[in-house]
Amino acid sequence: ERREEFETLVKELNLNERVHLLGLRTDVPELLKAVEVVVMSSHYEGLSLSNIEGMASGNPFVASDVDGLREITDGYGVLFPHEDDKTLADIILKLSTDEEYRQSVIEKCKKRAEQYDISNMSNAYFKVYQGLY
C-alpha cells in the first residue's frame, strides 16, 4: 500500500543500486542467505516467522527492541532501540568489520532458531505428553 512512497524515497536518496523492493516472495530462505545482515526494524511485532527465518538464515539477525521481537531475539540476535537509526548503523558496521563478533551472533541465532524447528518442537511436546502418563 506504501510501495510508491518507498520507490520515490529510494530514487530521491539515490539508493537504486542498494535498495530493492521485491514485493511478495516465496523464496525468502534463499534471499536471506544472500544478504550479510538480516534487519527487522518493526514498530511492533507478534511472534514472527520472519524473525525465526532471519535467525535461521546463517547471517546475523538485528531487530528493533519492541514487543514480540525482543522475546525471540534478546540474548541471541542483536537488539537496537526502536527508531534509533544511528545505533542500527553502528551495529551493522560492527557486524561487517568484527568477524569474531559476527560469528558469535550467527551461532547464537542458529541456536535460537533450532528451538523453533518443527522436529525439535514436536519432540518436546511428545516428552511433555509422555510425562502426563
Annotate each PLM feature.
Residues 24, 43:
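Aromatic "clamp/platform" in nucleotide-sugar-dependent glycosyltransferases that forms part
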Residues 78-85, 94-99:
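Conserved acidic donor-binding segment of nucleotide-sugar-dependent glycosyltransferases
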